Swiss-Prot record:
The lineage of its organism: Eukaryota, Metazoa, Chordata, Craniata, Vertebrata. Residues 153-183 form the ShKT domain. It comes from Mus musculus. It comes from the Eukaryota. PROSITE patterns: SHKT. Belongs to the MFAP family. This is Microfibrillar-associated protein 2.
Length: 183
């Protein structure tokens, strides 16, 4: 019984030793794995760093200091003749923006305390009160966004443009004003 217990105790160790058995040959020997690359490596390109005579760190530092840098100026465009200048049509970019002020009215709902008294007993209750606040608001308007909005409006509500050109704007003025800002 004692021998069986000792055998079972040492069994995992014996199994583990068998897994890590050292073979004299690696699983992928170099001579088998890389032999077809031998003809592709040119021996003239091979550089053995061990053949170089070792230099002291001071000599290496001095050789690094002797390296000169050559500064090459960047090419500058030659100025064109006055007749050759062509201006390209540019579309408004993201920098073509302006701040625009407009009157805006905001409606707020607040709870205002309201004092109510009955004979000599007073109590407070909250009453909902609507406050109209007239302000001057500021928005940033960019030209490229206005062009996109105008294109979308023209595509989506083409009848507004047709009616405006033909002079019949009043017949569709309400729908055009809601969608595109009027005729």
């Amino acid at each position: 019984m004692r021998a069986a217990c000792l055998f079972l105790l040492f069994m995992p160790g014996l199994l583990a030793q068998g897994q890590y058995d050292l073979d004299p040959l690696p699983p992928f020997p170099d001579h088998v794995q890389y032999n077809h690359y031998g003809d592709q490596i040119d021996n003239a390109d091979y550089y053995d760093y061990q053949e170089v005579s070792p230099r002291t760190p001071e000599e290496q530092f001095q050789s690094q200091q002797q390296v000169q840098q050559e500064v090459i100026p960047a090419p500058t465009p030659e100025p064109a003749a006055a007749g050759d200048l062509e201006t390209e049509p540019t579309e408004p970019g993201p920098l073509d923006c302006r701040e625009e002020q407009y009157p805006c009215t905001r409606l707020y709902s607040i709870h205002k305390p309201c004092k109510q008294c009955l004979n000599e007993v007073c109590f407070y209750s909250l009453r909902r009160v609507y406050v109209v606040n007239k302000e001057i608001c500021v928005r940033t308007v960019c030209a490229h966004e206005e062009l996109l909005r105008a294109d979308l409006c023209r595509d989506k509500f083409s009848k507004c443009g047709v009616m405006a050109v033909s002079g019949l704007c009043q017949s569709v003025a309400a729908s055009c004003a809601r969608s595109c800002g009027g005729c």
